[in-house]
Regions:
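Short terminal alpha-helical segments
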Residues: 1-57
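A structural signal for well-ordered alpha-helices, especially hydrophobic packing surfaces
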Residues: 21, 25-28, 82-85, 89-92, ...
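Amphipathic protein-protein interaction modules
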Residues: 57-116
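Internal, hydrophobic cores of structured domains that mediate oligomerization or house catalytic pockets
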Residues: 114-115, 119-124
Length: 125
């Protein structure tokens, strides 16, 4: 059974994953978009994760990447960031519902670690 779905372009999928990871790694972009202060874009913690996991199926992409490239350094980083996000997401969803919750997420040491670790993927990919 192929990991790729019918008519799915792996290059487009990969490019979209990297774009989503760049957004995940950019704390300044998050500050602007999550607060509604960006002149063109608006987003949220939930939307940031929804793009990566719901729209782009990040966990399936990790398996696809492994099937093509093996268990190399990038694969290990993908897995590590996936585990970190899975450990944090429930806290993030709850915090986001609070008044100024997005600010609390952006100041959370675990979220800051996730954004920094994601930069490692961007630099090595």
């Amino acid at each position: 059974m192929s990991i790729l779905e019918e008519n799915e372009d792996p290059l487009i999928w990969s490019n979209n994953i990297i774009k989503a990871l760049k957004d995940l790694s950019d704390i300044e972009f998050q500050k602007l978009t999550w607060s509604g202060e960006h002149p063109k874009f608006i987003s949220s913690f939930t939307e940031t994760l929804a793009i990566l996991y719901d729209d782009l199926d990040f966990e399936r992409y990790i398996e696809y990447y492994k099937s093509i490239n093996g268990m190399n350094r990038i694969y290990e980083l993908f897995n590590e960031i996936n585990l970190m996000i899975n450990d944090f997401k429930d806290i993030g969803y709850e915090t986001e519902m609070e008044i100024d919750g997005y600010k609390k997420i952006l100041e959370n040491k675990d979220w800051l670690l996730i954004t920094e670790k994601t930069k490692d993927i961007i630099h090595e990919y």
